[in-house]
């Protein structure tokens, strides 16, 4: 099945500590999780690796969010929207369900 949320889509977070935040999808994992730019930031404790010249300490990085907790952002309506699929000129295209605009 084709993915409704893809890399470089602008999404809005629907649930969790970052609810309401918007960002761009940087990575989509096959297990149904996505990485969103600037959202779901965690602090990792990393050990130093002298062989690679890496210093240890606290590192802030993005964690994955389940795809069910994000929705694609429709710039014309300024709201979260649902995605549909249809065939146009022999190609499968995605469209916003609220205004039938192709993504």
UniProtKB/Swiss-Prot annotation:
Record family assignment: Belongs to the universal ribosomal protein uL24 family.
Lineage, highest ranks first: Bacteria, Pseudomonadati, Pseudomonadota, Gammaproteobacteria, Pasteurellales
Keyword set, alphabetical order: Ribonucleoprotein, Ribosomal protein, RNA-binding, rRNA-binding
Gene Ontology process terms (BP): translation
This protein's name: Large ribosomal subunit protein uL24
Domain of life assignment: Bacteria
UniProt entry tagged with the keyword Ribosomal protein: yes
Signal sequence region: none
Complexes and interactors: Part of the 50S ribosomal subunit.
Protein function: One of two assembly initiator proteins, it binds directly to the 5'-end of the 23S rRNA, where it nucleates assembly of the 50S subunit. One of the proteins that surrounds the polypeptide exit tunnel on the outside of the subunit.
Species whose genome carries this gene: Histophilus somni (strain 2336) (Haemophilus somnus)
Molecular function (Gene Ontology), one example: rRNA binding
GO CC annotations on file: ribonucleoprotein complex; ribosome
Gene, per the UniProt record: rplX
Secreted keyword on record: no
């Amino acid at each position: 099945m084709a993915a409704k949320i893809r890399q470089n889509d602008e999404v809005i977070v629907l649930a969790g500590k970052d609810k309401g935040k918007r960002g761009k999808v940087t990575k989509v994992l096959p297990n149904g999780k996505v990485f969103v730019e600037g959202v779901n930031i965690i602090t990792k404790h990393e050990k130093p690796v002298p062989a690679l010249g890496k210093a240890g300490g606290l590192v802030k990085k993005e964690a994955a969010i389940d795809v069910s907790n994000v929705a694609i952002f429709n710039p014309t309506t300024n709201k979260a929207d649902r995605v549909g699929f249809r065939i146009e000129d022999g190609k499968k295209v995605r469209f916003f369900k609220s205004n039938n605009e192709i993504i």
